[in-house]
Amino acid sequence: MFCCLGYEWLSGGCKTWHSAWVINTLADHRHRGTDFGGSPWLLIITVFLRSYKFAISLCTSYLCVSFLKTIFPSQNGHDGSTDVQQRARRSNRRRQEGIKIVLEDIFTLWRQVETKVRAKICKMKVTTKVNRHDKINGKRKTAKEHLRKLSMKEREHGEKERQVSEAEENGKLDMKEIHTYMEMFQRAQALRRRAEDYYRCKITPSARKPLCNRVRMAAAEHRHSSGLPYWPYLTAETLKNRMGHQPPPPTQQHSIIDNSLSLKTPPECLLTPLPPSALPSADDNLKTPAECLLYPLPPSADDNLKTPPECLLTPLPPSAPPSVDDNLKTPPKCVCSLPFHPQRMIISRN
């Protein structure tokens, strides 16, 4: 550098702006702060050049430039602060991001071009293949028609798939709704059954209404005569509605008499005497009169009587009104209890 300056001075080309540029550069590299105070190379230059005017002009220019740099901070200078470092890092990052974006754009364009080229090559192949195939039949198709048909088929296939998926979704929703309704119905049924069981088990007969008890008793006694089904948990109102067109049931006294006299034999001939036998038989050892013997009745399923065999026939209780006993036409001597043989005396009972 010194040689260049000396060469310029000796050659007569005194270029002050070049010297100022050199001084400014040296000041930036050697001293980062203010340029006041001078440097040892300034003395060396003045001694080496041995020119008074040049030294004065050089010093004044150097001082002016240093003063201006002190007042106005340089845009290119680096003073070692954190802000400047961060700015430099940001600029480098932006530059790198810009490079990355440019590379991505290039690759994207390259992919697009490659896709277009491949589509064009495929189109050419399809055209040649179709033309070669249809050349025998005298037909000639273009690639556009073939691609149009392919696109139509793809659209139809996609539409069918969409319809199937919609039908499946609708079916799933319907099944879900049906399942929800079924669950609700089952829960309601369970609650209704629980309520019925609770009221059926918890309410005692003494806590029910007397009308309900009377109707239930009538239904229990006359279910066969009325032809109605009998449920013990029927209410009085329901049973009355069902029995609206039926004849009124008989009273309790008549029903008891009917139940006690429900024998298969006619009421006017409960005990009939046997015909007289000509020859003596095994019945002669019986000491009972002949007119009190009974016909042997056929065996029935209700013969499990728990009464002893000697008390099969018991005397009837005396009845005060004569109208009740008028229909009994049996002789009075056969009403009393007599010791009969247990195998020859069988009574049937409904």
Curated annotation (Swiss-Prot):
InterPro entries assigned to the protein according to its UniProt record, in alphabetical order: NPIP, NPIP_N
Region annotation Disordered: where it falls in the sequence: 306-325
A Pfam family annotated for this UniProt entry: NPIP
Highest taxon above the source species: Eukaryota
PANTHER family: NUCLEAR PORE COMPLEX INTERACTING PROTEIN, NUCLEAR PORE COMPLEX-INTERACTING PROTEIN FAMILY MEMBER A2-RELATED
Family: Belongs to the NPIP family.
Protein name as catalogued: Nuclear pore complex-interacting protein family member A3
Species of the source: Homo sapiens
Organism placement in taxonomy: Eukaryota, Metazoa, Chordata, Craniata, Vertebrata
Gene behind this protein: NPIPA3
